[in-house]
Amino acid sequence: MQLHNLEYKKGSRNHKEKRVGRGHGSGLGKTSGRGQDGQKARKSGMVRLAFEGGQTPLYRRVPKVGFNNDRFANKYNVVTLISLVKYETKELTVEFMYANKIAKNEDLPIKVIGNAVLPSGTVVSAHKFSKGALESISNSKAKAQILE
């Protein structure tokens, strides 16, 4: 490909600007494609979104509902036991998980979930464990160390 062989993508240069109010012959003269008189024929004539002609709009007729706990929820880096099995170290610390990108956000505490068989003697350190994870760790003769 060379500079003198470059071409525009097909259909990319066909859109012409709509010139309105330039006489009958243009096809968009007189009313400029706005139809006859009425609010929508005026320059600022569109009504706002969800306007229902003075009737109380649906979003005000329907009551507010529910509660979202997002602001108050405790957020965690969730780490599965299956993702920890492939590392052949005896100590799986929080620093190790951050360093190996097992847990992404260093600002959040780590919660270990899931069920997998860890090598016996492994010590897993985290801020929180699910019941299933604690059960799996104790069944595989490993230790769970809960951090503050």
Swiss-Prot record:
Q: Which domain of life is it from?
A: Bacteria
Gly residues bias: start-end ranges: 23-36
Q: According to the UniProt record, which cysteines are disulfide-bonded?
A: none
UniProt KW keywords: Ribonucleoprotein, Ribosomal protein, RNA-binding, rRNA-binding
Enumerate composition-biased segments (Basic and acidic residues).
1-10
- Enumerate the Pfam families for this protein: Ribosomal_L27A (PF00828)
Please give the Gene3D superfamilies that the UniProt record associates with this protein: 3.100.10.10
Tell me one GO biological process term: translation
> Which Gene Ontology terms of cellular component type are present?
cytosolic large ribosomal subunit
Report residue spans for region: Disordered. 1-42
GO MF entry, a single one: structural constituent of ribosome
Basic residues bias: where? Answer: 11-22
Describe its assembly.
Part of the 50S ribosomal subunit.
Q: Which family does it belong to?
A: Belongs to the universal ribosomal protein uL15 family.
Q: What does this protein do?
A: Binds to the 23S rRNA.
Q: What is this protein called?
A: Large ribosomal subunit protein uL15
Species of origin reads: Ureaplasma parvum serovar 3 (strain ATCC 700970)
